[in-house]
Amino acid sequence: MTEMVEIRPLAPNSWPDLCALFGRNGANSGCWCMWWRESANEWAEGNNANRERFEQVVTSGEPTGLLAYADGNPVGWCAVAPREAYPRLFRSPHLKPADPDESGVWSVSCFFIKRTHRRQGLRRTLLDAAVDHAGRMGAAVVEGYPVDTREKPSGDLFTGTVDLFLEAGFAEHIARGGRRIVMRRRP
């Protein structure tokens, strides 16, 4: 990536920047980064409800993630927060924690890169920044839930790929079958 990129934690005053990046569709199918945070019934309420709920999370001051800026404009997003912020992980047969009571675990749960900035290494830059950020916030370990595309391609890459996480120093932690595996590293 040749452009200078600045990475900042999402804060209430940068909510409009996230909205500009995500657009009317909330990044992906009206998600607004709520897939891992909500029940299936809440998720089914759709785009506007997800947007409102995520705005409430952001304005509460709870950690949510990092925004990447190029030339002052938002171009990328990485969700990173304490694992307990993502209750859907605890219900997932493939991703549920081996020890749900383990403390100090932070999760990198998704990425969104503006179309004009894809395939330039920004996802890796955001992942490295997320690990550093989680460490500064007290994380003992950082988890990710990437898709393994080494044998079968996938169009569902919002959580990243195994190769991306391997390149960033993560190691496989849990693989229970399915498309995603749990990977970890220490900050």
Residue ranges and their predicted role:
Residues 155-168, 173-187:
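C-terminal "cap" of GNAT-fold acetyltransferases
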Residues 127, 134-155:
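Conserved GNAT acetyl-CoA-binding A-motif
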Residues 56, 69, 73-110, 114, ...:
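Conserved acyl-donor/pantetheine-binding loop and adjacent beta-alpha core of acyl/acetyltransferases
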Residues 1-36:
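Conserved N-terminal entry element of GNAT/NAT acetyltransferase domains
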Residues 24-43, 69-70, 74-87, 100, ...:
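Conserved donor-binding loop and adjoining core beta-sheet/short helix segment
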Residues 108-113, 119-136:
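Conserved acetyl-CoA-binding loop-helix of GNAT-fold acetyltransferases
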Residues 32-64:
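Active-site rim helix/loop that mediates acceptor-substrate recognition in acyltransferases
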